[in-house]
Amino acid sequence: MKQIRRWQRILILALLSISVFAPLIFVSNRLKSITPVGRREFIEELSKIRFTTNDLRLSAIEHEDGEGLKGPRLILFKDGEFNSSAESDGGNTYKNREEQVIVSQKMTVSSDEKGQILPTVNQLANKTDFKPPLSKGEKNTRVQPDRATDVKTKEIRDKIIQAKAYLNFAPPGSNSQVVKELRGRLKELERSVGDATKDKDLSKGALRRVKPMENVLYKASRVFNNCPAIATKLRAMNYNTEEQVQAQKNQAAYLMQLAARTTPKGLHCLSMRLTSEYFSLDPEKRQMPNQQNYFDANFNHYVVFSDNVLASSVVVNSTISSSKEPERIVFHVVTDSLNYPAISMWFLLNIQSKATIQILNIDDMDVLPRDYDQLLMKQNSNDPRFISTLNHARFYLPDIFPGLNKMVLLDHDVVVQRDLSRLWSIDMKGKVVGAVETCLEGESSFRSMSTFINFSDTWVAGKFSPRACTWAFGMNLIDLEEWRIRKLTSTYIKYFNLGTKRPLWKAGSLPIGWLTFYRQTLALDKRWHVMGLGRESGVKAVDIEQAAVIHYDGVMKPWLDIGKENYKRYWNIHVPYHHTYLQQCNLQA
């Protein structure tokens, strides 16, 4: 009996020893396997538990005061809530912790509810796409996007403005200690900041000089404390600054317009070389081929009015290269006597083997009035583009091409990207002009009648509506036969003469075109003609790629230095920069 009791005591002591030393052994092994990052997380978890005991105790008291105990909230997750492939490792670790807490909460529910909980836990495990564990030494933090900010830069520039303002408050010739220190700190800070626009561009020296500047500004605020005088001075400074900004804007706009009106040196050089080459040819060699197709109505006829060699070349080349049947194309290039030799020589040197090209001199035709140039000068515009004969000669198309019934009118600042032959199959429904409308508010191409036309005039207000839908030149399908029936050229001449006597519309061919073809236009799908590449319009790249014709309307033409670089590439691919004349005139992409 004593032997049995002794063995019982030994067994009990052994079990007690195991219960004491076993946890120590397991915990020590666990701590050895924890990485430095894991130890830091373990300590952070302990600190969170230590500081949240009071909250837990208060929460327990609140539950006791309630009507009854509530079970744990069962959180259901959807497939869309777990997208580990698009998140960082740190984000997945954070989500894994939440899932462990949720599972542990569910395991504490009574056994009666286990049948409902276990399928939910299994569903959670099946739907979750877990990432592999973090490697040793890898940071367990969320990846922050690297965004360049300018908060500190703006703060520093604000302090520079404050310092300049305080210096303006100082009496003339003042040489006090505060003024000296303010000038010194201002020079140092301006030199350190330089032209930085983002915080990443700031040097360490600039950041170190912020605190001394703040101290000097505080001293200056104690010295210059006459608030009414300071307010008056600040208002004067604000007014002067606004005047300077407005003057700079006006100057920039003027220079932009001046650049748009000026012929680049390279283009002038090219025209001179081509003109010289043209007059060195024998008269019989100046003739273009396939002249029998000029007035054949079975062909697809295009017309462009231009005084620019490269611009007209791009329009012709892009149209032919985009066509499925280039042999059916007849292209009429209408220019003036000054540019006729250069443009003729260019197309003689670069003859299109399939299409037919005709070069016309508007000055050799008898379709325009003799005093047309003087009438155009009465439009009170200094911009030669608006008072150009070529710009208004489009209203005489039925007289220029008496043997044709339908044609497509293209401006010389467009690029054709799609086959345009389908335009000839469009039913015009008795209309004269097919065009893309520009009357949808909110779009970059939006234009209103009231912006360009003077509806305060009684004659205009009684005949036209300011809410009528506008449309654009640039790519237009013209029914010349219907034009002749409605005698719209006579209508244009009538309106033009009225406009020379009193201001009825802004200079240019677009406003008078709206009036001449009022209610005579057919709306085309906007993908036929996308505008805005020659100005700040924000046209979408998708719209450009899908467009049949893209239009560089505005002053930022692709052949000018002020053209938008991201849009020039559509134009440059149709310019033969390898040509000898272009290289000699230093014309480059």
From Swiss-Prot:
The residues that cross the membrane are 7-27
Chain ranges sitting on the Lumenal side read 28-589
Tree of life domain: Eukaryota
The record's annotation in InterPro entries points to: GAUT (IPR029993), Glyco_trans_8 (IPR002495), Nucleotide-diphossugar_trans (IPR029044)
Q: Which GO terms describe its biological process?
A: cell wall organization; pectin biosynthetic process
Q: According to its record, how does it sit in the membrane?
A: Single-pass type II membrane protein
Q: What is its EC number?
A: 2.4.1.-
Give the tissue specificity: Expressed in roots, inflorescences, siliques, leaves and stems.
Task: Give the span(s) annotated as Disordered.
Answer: 127-151
Q: Does the keyword Transport apply?
A: no
Question: Which UniProt key words apply to this protein?
Answer: Cell wall biogenesis/degradation, Glycoprotein, Glycosyltransferase, Golgi apparatus, Membrane, Signal-anchor, Transferase, Transmembrane, Transmembrane helix
Pathway assignment reads: Glycan metabolism; pectin biosynthesis
Topological domain, Cytoplasmic: which ranges? Answer: 1-6
According to the UniProt entry, which residue ranges have a biased composition of type Basic and acidic residues?
136-151
In its UniProt record, a GO molecular function of this protein is: polygalacturonate 4-alpha-galacturonosyltransferase activity
State the family it belongs to: Belongs to the glycosyltransferase 8 family.
Q: What does this protein do?
A: Probably involved in pectin biosynthesis in cell walls.
- The protein's name is Probable galacturonosyltransferase 6
* Species: Arabidopsis thaliana (Mouse-ear cress)
